[in-house]
Amino acid sequence: VHLQCHIGTDTLSLARLGAQVTGLDFSPESLKQARALAGDAVTFVEADVYSAPDVLGRERFDLVYTGIGALCWLPDIRRWAQVVRDLLVPGGRLFIREGHPVLWALDLDDPRHLRIEYPYFETAEPVVDSVEQTYVATDRSVQNATTHSWNHGLGEIVSALLDAGFTLTRLDEHRTVPWNALGGQMIADERGEYALIERPERLPVTYTLEAVRTVDPGGGREAPGPASAGS
C-alpha cells in the first residue's frame, strides 16, 4: 500500500514492477488524476492516513511505501508509525524515501543565503505558510494557498518505529534530491537527481529507511503470517 499517494506516479511504478498495489490519499482531485493515469492497474482509496486501517477494512499488506513530501503533512509521527504497523502483516516491510528534516528546516526562499528557519523536531503547532505555485507544471493558480506542515526529526521517526514494534534494517542519508531544492546551488546528474555543486558532502537532503514489523506492542516477537493482500 502506498500512503499519501497523491496523483499516483510512484504507485503506478510499483504496479509496473508486478505488485498488486493500493494507493491511499485524502484528496479526491488527486485521486481523480491518479485513476486517469493508472487505469485498472491500481486500486485507489480516498482517506487520510490515520484512518487507513479502518477504511481498508483491517486488510494487511506485505509492504507500506511512502515517498518524498508526505510525512510533513502529518502532525503526529508516533501515531503514523502505529498506523503503518497495523497495515502490515508480521514480517511486512516499510520503505520510505523522504526529504531530510535538515532540508525542511531551512528557509529556501533565498538559496544563496541559507539559514535554519523552521523546526527540525516535531512541534505541537504547525508551520503555517502560503504558497503561490505548485510543483506540478501548470498555468493554473493555487486555490487553497495556506499550508500547515510539521517537521519530524530523524531520531523521532526511528524511535516511533522502534516503539511501534519495528526492526530497523537500513537507514541511509543522501546528497541528492529529485528537484532543484536549492536554486542555483544545485546541479542535476544523469538520473535527474540534484546535488550541491560545491562540496555536496556538507548537506543531507534526502534519506531512505527500511524497517520490518517484527515485534508486538508488548515486546513479544510475532510469528510471520500470510498476507491478505500484497503490494
Show where each model-derived region lies.
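Class I SAM-dependent methyltransferase SAM/SAH-binding core
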Residues: 1-53
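Conserved class I S-adenosyl-L-methionine
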Residues: 93-135
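Acceptor-substrate binding/catalytic loop of class I
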Residues: 98-112, 140-156
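A short glycine-rich, Lys/Arg-flanked "PGG" loop and its adjoining helix->strand segment in the class I
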Residues: 78-93
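A short SAM/SAH-binding and catalytic strip from SAM-dependent methyltransferases
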Residues: 62-78
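Short alpha-helix
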Residues: 147-171
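Core SAM-dependent methyltransferase catalytic element
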Residues: 164-166, 188-190, 194, 198-225
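A short acidic, Gly/Pro-enriched loop at the edge of an enzyme's catalytic core
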Residues: 54-64
